Amino acid sequence: MAERHLFTSESVSEGHPDKIADQISDAILDELLKKDPDSRVAVETSVTTGLVLVFGEVSTKAYVNIQQIVRDTIRKIGYTDGKYGFDADNCAVITAIDEQSPDIAQGVDDSLETREGEADPLDKIGAGDQGLMFGYATDETPEYMPLTLVLSHKLMRKIAQLRKDGVISYLRPDAKAEVTVEYDENDKPLRVDTVVLSTQHDPEVSLDQIKKDIKEQVIEAVIPAEYLDDQTKYFINPTGRFVIGGPQGDAGLTGRKIIVDTYGGAAHHGGGAFSGKDATKVDRSASYAARYIAKNIVAAGYAKKAEIQVAYAIGVAEPVSIMINTYGTGTRSEEELIAAVRKAFDLRPAGIIEMLDLKRPIYKQTAAYGHFGRTDVDLPWEHLDKVDELKEILG
């Protein structure tokens, strides 16, 4: 864009109903992978007042106690009181798990390439579904993520920390944040224009107290002072009351916060959610690989921001297409970058799994506060270990 403009991203807390569902699905996935790294998992979760429904398809040699995983996850989030309308010890947990369809399994177990006689073992696994996936990176923050989303996630992490540490005693687990940043003509962040933050709370506390505490202890503690000015607008619990929340206020479902999970609306999204899926599902693994590519391209100095698209056919190992968009900021042509990516990154499902070591139980930690740009946990797709290889290829 050639003029100043506003852009907004949002995040939600770990106690948001959709995020409860994501965390339960990924907690089950992790437990299965701990016991059987080759588990095929597609677990969905739905939560509502007093009820958790876990359903989907699993093929595994492992046994896991789903009831216990569900209750432990809810307890860790902070739903431990019947007054919340949903709590770890008293909610009902219903499971309805089937095996993976043999029609899907035959294409994943033996890809089209293998059936046609290819000998490369990394050709063996076919994509678990057709689909298109995107990865993105920008140099506007040290995390290589949009500032709007980085700040939104940090606000949610901070409010959860204050709640769990008992610093603000009236906080309940459900919360949302939204940050609007003003950018200059060159897409550089200038200032924070608007902060929206809604948090669930106990009934006794006054709105004035909430506004004071959230502004001082959350917003001003998280957002650097140079981004805030006397024109910055604050909307803190703008409905005036947020006592009923969590699954009692809204039903939650796995996979409904895909923009919070990714790039806050700054990049395209192929539509496939991540949580509850093992790495043979390219919705997840190829999105991670695309982020890995984009971040290494930007870190290597070949673009100020980059978006990667990859697409797959079910049962076929090789991607059907790779696209790179550097938004006019590239120091190499997009054709050159794609050629380098094909040399440096193996985008077959088995290649991605090996490259990023994705058979490990590392997923529950991604199910709240974003899958990308994380500095609090070590995620392989955030590593910058391909920068030198890209420089070697591209010169």
Swiss-Prot record:
Belongs to the AdoMet synthase family. Residues 100-110 are annotated as: Flexible loop. The lineage of its organism: Bacteria, Bacillati, Bacillota, Bacilli, Lactobacillales. Keywords: ATP-binding, Cytoplasm, Magnesium, Metal-binding, Nucleotide-binding, One-carbon metabolism, Potassium, Transferase. Its cofactor is Mg(2+); K(+). Binds 2 divalent ions per subunit. It catalyses: L-methionine + ATP + H2O = S-adenosyl-L-methionine + phosphate + diphosphate. Homotetramer; dimer of dimers. L-methionine binds at E57, Q100, D250, K281. It comes from Limosilactobacillus reuteri (strain DSM 20016) (Lactobacillus reuteri). This is S-adenosylmethionine synthase.
